[in-house]
């Protein structure tokens, strides 16, 4: 009799355990995400859709995900180990980054090199030389640190105001826009500190480049 009672108690506990697991799975894995997605789609439709930025009626990026710009008349972003997941396809459908290396798939993060790692030193040296070649009026000592260092995610869409301003002369020559006009574009796309005290002032690279494209007549509608 005691053995039967023990078996009954065991299976009852097992049933309760599976029941709780199933309920939590449904609540946390289905009900909560669906409810949260539904509420956010109604209250914050743009943010729920990825905070997309539009130009000429089509999505060209997101406010919170950086992308790689290679044209000389566009502002440059911070380094990214995954080139901001920007790639091109050849005739055979093979995907490559802009430097010709194979596309690694959609990724984020960085190489996490130690400061003493020779690979990091070589990467920074190469990036400095590339930047100086594109910005001949700038000296090595004037380059802001964030232009040579990757963000934690490798996808940061912002740079510092100093990093934006130092690129203005070269962009002015390549785009035909005046430095004053470019300075105003940078100011228009500068976001201040949160509540005036948290974080640092930042410049949206995508926002700046969309305004540059609009000023050059490359896009007819700027949808920030």
Language-model regions, residue ranges each:
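Flexible, solvent-exposed loop/hinge segments and secondary-structure transition points
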Residues: 8, 12, 16, 20, ...
């Amino acid at each position: 009799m005691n053995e039967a009672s023990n078996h009954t108690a065991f299976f009852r506990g097992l049933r309760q355990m599976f029941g709780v697991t199933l309920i939590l799975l449904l609540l946390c894995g289905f009900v909560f995400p669906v409810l949260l997605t539904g509420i956010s789609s109604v209250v914050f439709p743009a943010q729920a859709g990825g905070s997309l930025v539009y130009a000429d009626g089509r999505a060209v990026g997101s406010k919170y995900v950086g992308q790689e710009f290679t044209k000389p008349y566009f502002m440059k972003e911070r380094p990214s180990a995954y080139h901001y997941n920007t790639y091109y396809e050849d005739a055979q459908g093979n995907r490559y980054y802009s430097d010709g290396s194979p596309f690694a798939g959609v990724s984020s993060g960085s190489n996490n090199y130690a400061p003493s790692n020779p690979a990091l030193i070589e990467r920074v040296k190469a990036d400095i030389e590339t930047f100086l070649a594109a910005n001949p009026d700038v000296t090595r000592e004037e380059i802001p640190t964030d232009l040579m260092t990757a963000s934690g995610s490798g996808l940061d869409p912002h740079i510092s105001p100093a990093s934006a301003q130092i690129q203005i002369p070269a962009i002015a020559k390549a785009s035909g826009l005046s430095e004053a006009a470019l300075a105003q574009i940078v100011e228009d796309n500068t976001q201040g500190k949160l509540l005036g005290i948290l974080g640092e002032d930042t410049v949206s690279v995508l926002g700046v480049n969309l305004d540059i494209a609009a000023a050059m007549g490359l896009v007819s509608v700027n949808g920030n």
